[in-house]
UniProtKB/Swiss-Prot annotation:
PANTHER family linked to this entry: METALLOPROTEASE SLR0863, UNCHARACTERIZED PROTEIN TLDD AND PMBA
GO MF terms, alphabetically ordered: metallopeptidase activity
Any single Gene Ontology cellular-component annotation: cytosol
A UniProt-annotated Pfam family: PmbA_TldD_1st
InterPro entries: Metalloprtase-TldD/E_C (IPR045569), Metalloprtase-TldD/E_cen_dom (IPR045570), Metalloprtase-TldD/E_N (IPR002510), Peptidase_U62_metallo (IPR051463), TldD (IPR025502), TldD/PmbA_N (IPR035068), TldD/PmbA_sf (IPR036059)
Protein name: Metalloprotease AF_0655
Family label: Belongs to the peptidase U62 family.
Gene Ontology process terms (BP): proteolysis
Entry EC number(s): 3.4.-.-
Described purpose of this protein according to its UniProt entry: Probable metalloprotease.
Keyword terms: Hydrolase, Metalloprotease, Protease
């Protein structure tokens, strides 16, 4: 047996949903699960079950039934972490949390034909040990609210806002501002213009630029994709891949939604500079990909006790020196795009296509009419070679899916000016 590890994960979660003023049945879940891995003759054996450690490892070893080329970076980590919060939501009543949703729904009700609000909290406790001598334990709490409304005018439009971070109920301080943003924007959006089309100058807001760096670039630097040859960045370490103003970072130590103190292979979390001054400096690694490619481990994550795979955490474009008004002036004529409604990317080709929540025409360096149903597409590396970056960064929370697993992440960026193709969504 070359290597073994054991993970025990406890999850305690509460989900409340208020749809059109009606409360759905609260969903409370508490689960404990154990995952076992054994590396034998270069092949991984996996077993999941709430059994004694020796039995779990025996079952995992039985599943390592052939030979392979697997290997792992030997790292021994010892540590404990417990998140301190100002207001533990588990000390509060469900009624108080429901009342918050009702108050937020009242704010947006008059501008919506339908509403949906969700409150959630999740406490994750991970215990990890391995044959290298690692012994790690941590507890992290995440809390959040999402607010969604549909409005009707010349068109039917959907708008959503979220406030989610690691921490206790204090995370939701000021969440009513998100509701008031919907009240401000949605009545204008339902009567907004159709967007222009063609290649043009685009200013992405922090939210859309964050989605861009996560989806279009971040997945391309995950080392399992590199090993599979499924990324345009394979073989390009220490090459210039972007404008000198571009620095891209993945940092799980930031107190954002993608925070973790140790990854799911027991490696202590640390800030990773992926691109520095336009030069590709590193990929994101698990212990196995770090061994094969010579990188630094610490980005192996899993949902529950599923097999850990290479994932992002809090990924962002670092700040530069342009103010927002200066970006508009540099743009002169084009569009300003706000928020994201999803899209698609292909790390192997660098192509991406995203839908913004809404936007504004930019005329003579100033914001003009609002536009709706607008999309953005282009080639990731071509866009990054010709950008101007703002100086005020914001982060957006979300869940990232890969290989059937969802993990919490954040992406962030200042506003970014680029050239891209714009069209209808």
């Amino acid at each position: 047996m070359r290597f073994w590890d054991i993970r025990r994960v406890e999850n305690v979660s509460l989900n409340l949903q208020l749809e059109n003023g009606k409360l759905e049945k609260p969903r409370y879940n508490k689960s404990t699960s154990k995952g076992f891995r054994v590396l034998k003759n270069g092949f991984w054996g996996i077993f999941e079950g709430n059994v004694a450690d020796d039995e779990g490892l025996r079952q995992a070893e039985k599943n390592a039934f052939t030979q392979g080329d697997g290997d792992i970076e030997e790292i021994a980590t010892k540590g404990r972490y417990r998140m301190r919060v100002k207001r533990d939501p588990q000390d509060m009543s469900i009624e108080e949390k429901v009342e918050l949703l009702k108050d937020l729904e009242k704010i947006i009700r008059d501008v919506c034909v339908s509403t949906k609000l969700v409150y959630f909290e999740n406490r994750r406790v991970l215990q990890y040990r391995d044959s290298c001598g690692s012994e790690v334990e941590y507890e992290v709490l995440r809390t959040g609210v999402s607010i969604m409304g549909v409005g009707k005018g010349r068109s039917l439009q959907f708008l959503s806002k979220r406030q989610m971070r690691v921490g206790g109920y204090e995370v939701l301080d000021g969440v009513d501002e998100k509701a008031y943003e919907i009240v401000e924007v949605l009545p204008k959006l339902v009567n907004a213009l159709a967007p222009p089309s063609g290649e043009m100058s685009v200013v992405m807001d922090s939210s859309l630029a964050g989605v861009f760096v996560h989806e279009a670039f971040g997945h391309a630097v995950e080392a399992d994709h590199v090993l599979q040859g499924a990324t345009v960045l394979k073989g390009r370490l220490n090459e210039k891949v972007a404008d000198e103003s571009v620095t891209i970072i993945d940092d799980p130590t930031l107190p954002e939604f993608g925070f973790f103190p140790f990854d799911d292979e027991g490696v202590r979390a640390e800030k990773k500079v992926i691109v520095e001054d336009g030069v590709l400096k590193s990929f994101l690694h698990s212990r196995e990909t770090a061994k094969k490619l010579g990188g630094v481990a610490g980005n192996a994550r899993s949902q529950g006790v599923d097999v850990p795979i290479v994932r992002m955490s809090n990924t962002y474009i670092d700040t530069h020196h342009y103010s927002f008004d200066e970006l508009l002036e540099e743009c002169r004529d084009g569009v300003y795009l706000v928020g994201s409604r999803g899209g698609e990317t292909n790390p192997a080709t660098g192509y991406f296509h995203f839908n913004a929540q809404y936007g504004y025409l930019i005329k003579n360096g100033e914001l003009a009419e609002m536009v709706r149903d607008v999309s953005l597409s282009g080639n990731t590396l071509e866009i990054l070679r010709n950008v101007k970056i703002g100086r005020e960064i914001e982060f957006d929370p979300g869940f990232c899916g890969k290989a059937g697993q969802l993990v919490p992440v954040s992406d962030g960026s200042p506003p970014v000016l680029c050239r891209a193709t714009v069209g209808g969504a």
